[in-house]
A protein has these predicted regions:
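Asp-box/WD-like beta-propeller blade repeats and closely related beta-sheet repeat scaffolds
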Residues: 114-115, 132-179, 194-204
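Short coil/turn segments at the loop-to-beta-strand junctions that recur within blades
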Residues: 62, 103-111, 150-157, 199-204, ...
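Blade/loop signatures of beta-propeller domains
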Residues: 23-59
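Beta-strand-rich domains and repeat architectures in extracellular enzymes and scaffolds
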Residues: 53-87
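Repeated scaffold domains used in trafficking and secretory/extracellular systems
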Residues: 68-71, 113-118, 153-162, 205-213, ...
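Blade-loop segments of beta-propeller domains
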Residues: 59-64, 68, 97-124, 131
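Conserved blade-ending motifs and adjacent loop-strand segments that build the rim/top face
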Residues: 244-269, 306-350, 364
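C-terminal motif of bacterial Sec signal peptides marking the signal peptidase cleavage site
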Residues: 16-18
Length: 396
């Protein structure tokens, strides 16, 4: 199933050893019994965690047509989007009104080539456009090019903490051209404070390759995960440390082979018994996981206070209505609040909420299968309309 859906731009991750704050050792990390939870279906209700939903239809004009949204950054006042098909960065306000294109593709000052991700520093009102193999380009929120950031050449993305420190996501371009770490903590002046690599012990360095990194920011920190390790790392303003242990209980050789450039594509590596992780995110009260095993995809939700773990399989209809991860999919939980689209918000908001995007093709596909009969009217958009951005606020 993992190969039938366009996979995350780069689910990438790390290995771990404690570094300080939240828990002092790996043994103190919360353990999430992923495999055993798959044996029993337990309904998961959005009402237990989500307190409000806001729908924002994006203005549609010839200047801002969105066909393939690959990244979204939601700040206090704006939304910045990377449209992969046209290689454009678009800026909208929080009501969905189009404001401007930011920068342009090219080889001159302030012009970008191949974009990997966007990042925002809401305190300083700055947008960073990360490129494969080049400096990050920094713009003000009014679209003015400010500078090249030469301190993040090895990063493919970042998250800025309130104190100005930055969590960096390692850049993966292609085999043997990658950052020496999967994640790092950096001072505002560019000095690296901590970094973390996560290859299995005993794997020769000349074959190590991390093809996927999951980099999931929240108000608490940034979660990092990689297929070759069951520990989820946390990058926080005061260090890097283990955050969770996912008991996938895959065969020992899987963890070695999935990180080996000579073996990770072999059909024998990802069998129907392997449990993989597409992506994950945190709310103040829960850890959410999107998993696959064979042809099935599951959502699991871990209660950070009680340790309760709920698991449910995603209906095949939702998979058939989806095109890609990230962006063009509704591979999520049933919306039991207002009957809207299945819930899986892939993007973080500056205020700690989460955001999801749905386009007209997905909405039409869901309706053809009999869904969205009670959905809010705002989801009735025209055939040529831009997507709708959905903002979720969580319980505190």
């Amino acid at each position: 199933m993992k190969n039938t859906i366009l996979l995350l731009n780069g689910l990438w991750l790390l290995g771990l050893v404690a570094c300080q704050p939240k828990s002092s050792s790996l043994s103190e990390c919360p353990i999430v019994n992923v495999r055993s939870a798959l044996q029993e279906e337990t309904p998961i209700s959005m009402k237990e965690d989500v307190v409000s939903i806001q729908y924002i239809p994006l203005e549609t004009t010839d200047s801002c047509l969105i066909s393939n949204l690959l990244n979204l950054q939601v700040t206090t006042d704006y939304m910045f989007m990377y449209n992969g098909k046209t290689e454009e960065v678009l800026q909208f306000d929080r009501k969905g009104k189009f404001i401007r294109r930011v920068g342009r593709q090219g080889n001159g000052p302030g012009e970008y080539s191949m974009i990997s991700e966007l990042a925002v520093d809401d305190s300083n009102k700055e947008l960073s456009i990360f490129q494969y193999g080049g400096d990050a380009l920094v713009y003000s929120y009014d679209g003015t090019f400010l500078r090249n950031d030469t301190t993040v050449k090895q990063a493919g993305g970042m998250y800025v903490f309130a104190d100005g420190k930055r969590a960096l996501k390692g850049l993966v371009m292609k085999p043997f051209e990658q950052a020496p770490w999967a994640g790092a903590l950096q001072q505002p002046d560019g000095l690296l404070l901590k970094s973390k690599s996560l290859f299995p012990q005993g794997l020769s360095q000349d074959v190590c390759f991390m093809k996927e990194i999951c980099f999931s920011p929240s108000t608490e920190g940034v979660l990092l995960f990689t297929a070759c390790n069951d520990t989820v790392a946390g990058i926080y303003a005061n260090g890097i440390e283990p955050a969770y242990v996912l008991k996938r209980e895959n065969p020992t050789e899987y963890y070695m082979d999935i990180a080996n450039i000579n073996k990770f594509r072999d059909n024998t590596v990802e069998t129907d018994q392997i449990i993989g992780v597409y992506d994950l995110f945190e709310s103040p009260h829960y850890l959410y996981l999107r998993l696959y095993k064979g042809d099935a995809i599951f959502i699991q939700r871990f209660d950070k206070k009680t340790g309760e773990l709920k698991s449910q399989r995603i209906p095949d209809d939702y998979l058939e209505c989806s095109a890609a991860i990230p962006g063009g999919n509704v591979i999520g939980m049933d919306n039991d609040i207002d009957g809207g689209i299945p819930f899986w918000p892939e993007y973080v908001m500056a205020d700690g909420g989460r955001a999801q995007v749905v386009n007209v093709d997905i909405l039409l596909a869901l309706r053809e299968k009999g869904y969205l009969k009670q959905a809010p009217d705002v989801l009735n958009i025209g055939d040529e309309a831009n997507p709708v951005v959905i903002l979720y606020t969580f319980k505190r």
